[in-house]
Every structure is written in structure tokens, then in C-alpha cells.
Amino acid sequence: KTEYTNASTTQMYNSEKYEWSYDLLKKLGIPTDILTDVIFPGEIVGKVKPELAEELGIEQVPVVAVASHDTGSAVASVPVVDQKDFIYISSGTWSLMGVELDKPNTSDGAFNHNFTNEGGVNKTIRFLKNIMGLWLIQESRRQWDREGELLSFDELERQANAAEPFASLVDPDYAEFQTPGNMPKRIKEYCKKTGQKVPETKGEVVRCIAESLAFKYRQTVEGMEDVTGNKYNVVNIVGGGIKDKMICQFTANATKRVVSTGPVEATSIGNVIVQAMAMGAIKDINEG
């Protein structure tokens, strides 16, 4: 069987009808008989196989379908009171930034902002934008390591905080930044090409990245509000990126929103919450 949150990212699934897009697939010559039934997070799909239970030394416990798309599980872990008031960032190598909707938004505005509709827990829609995230810092750090100087993230953050603010900005989603390589060099070339001050030190490069991400988040918040017609007062950041306190603070400054952080292990916690709901340990996602 195919789990809903994953099916929704294949471009073969109709999230309005909750079924495969059979007509479209037939027109494209894609055989539909290879597609399996779609199941939803929280459904019990069977029990652990006897041989596996024996190997693990456990009983044949139920197997629960969770949000198998990692961002789907991460969003399920976001600790919020008002489901309509928050915008989330699942922060890691990529930043997945969006809101939860009851149904897909396929408006011209969504298309123009390059927003996508992906499935979530409880048949919700994760209406989001994919943004290049901490990859830029990670790849810069790898380059400096290749050059013989591996600095901790804490040290890079210290140097960045000491650098001049708003000296230069880049588009984190610029095509040249997408692949592995000498990221500091590419960032410097981008700044030179766009007539900006070229960052020279490691601290200047990292500050450029951090501020650029924060402004990208602001642009996305404004786009989300424009397309949905809602006002989002809180930005909830989950995932490993919350360890970067500087970017979290810059995000609060740029978006002029309250920023709430945690959990770090968002995907794992969201996974457990769905299993707990399925087994009756908690009554709903809010209790989780």
C-alpha cells in the first residue's frame, strides 16, 4: 500500500478527491494497475511478521501507518494551540515553510509564489514552499574543512554575529547554490555579480547566508498571507535548524513575528504521536 503523505508528493495523486489521478495518468500513458491502495496516517495495516517479532524478541505488535513523508511527521509535532495562527518551518538542509489547510489551494497566487500542496496528518494539506536551508552553511563549512580549517557551528555563529549586518544578501534558491562544491566562492561571485559588497571572512559569509534566509522567510510569510487571506502571528521552527539561535533570532527580526522553537527531533516525535493516536494512548494530535 502507499501512504497518503508520500502519495501526495508524486504528482500522480488528486488531493481534492483523495485518489490517484487516473484520468491524467492514462493520458500520459502511465499504467494505473501498478498503483496500490492509499492508506492514511493512523491506520493499522497489520502486525509485525512472526519471524521479525522473534528476531527482535517482541510480540506481534500492530504496525501503524505514520506520515511517511518526513515533513508530514515533522509538522504533526509542531506544538500549537491555534491551528490557524501559525506558520511552520521544518528547518534542516532544506527549509520547508508553510501552513496547514483543510483542502488544497491551487489558485493562481499559489502557482505564482511556487507553493505546493502536500498531504498531512488527519487528511490536512501542508501548503508550503521548499527553500534551500542550512545547506548553504553546511556546504561552506565542508569547503573550509577541505581547506584545512574546520570550525564548529558555534564558532561560525560567533564570527557571524561580529560581522557587519546587511552588508550583502543572496537568493538562497539561486540555481548555482543547489549542488555540492565551493559554496563560499559561489556566494562571493553572486555578490560581485549583483554589485554588492563581497563577503571576505568566514563570519561575513555566514552572516550573509543567515540574513538571506531570514528575509526569504519573511517573503514567504507575506506570500502565504496574500494567497490564503489569513494572518499568521507565530512562526514555529522545528528540526535541527533550531540549534542555530542566530538564524532563529534573525527570522523573528525579519518577519516581525513571534518565533517558537522545538522540538529538535520533530519527525520522530510526529511519528510517535500518530502511533499513539492509533493505539488510543492519546485522543488527538493536540493532546500529543
Language-model segments: residues:
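Active-site core segments that coordinate phosphate-bearing ligands/cofactors
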Residues: K1, M12-Y22, K26-K27, P50-V234, ...
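Short beta-strand-loop/turn "lid" adjacent to the catalytic site in phosphate-handling enzymes
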Residues: K1-N14, D37-F40
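Short glycine-enriched loop/turn motifs at secondary-structure junctions
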Residues: T5-A7, T32, N122
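A conserved helix-loop-beta module that forms one wall/lid of the active-site cleft
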Residues: L25-E43, V272
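Small/polar loops that bind or transfer phosphate-bearing groups
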Residues: F40, G239, P263
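Active-site neighborhood for divalent-cation/phosphate handling
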Residues: E43-V45, S73
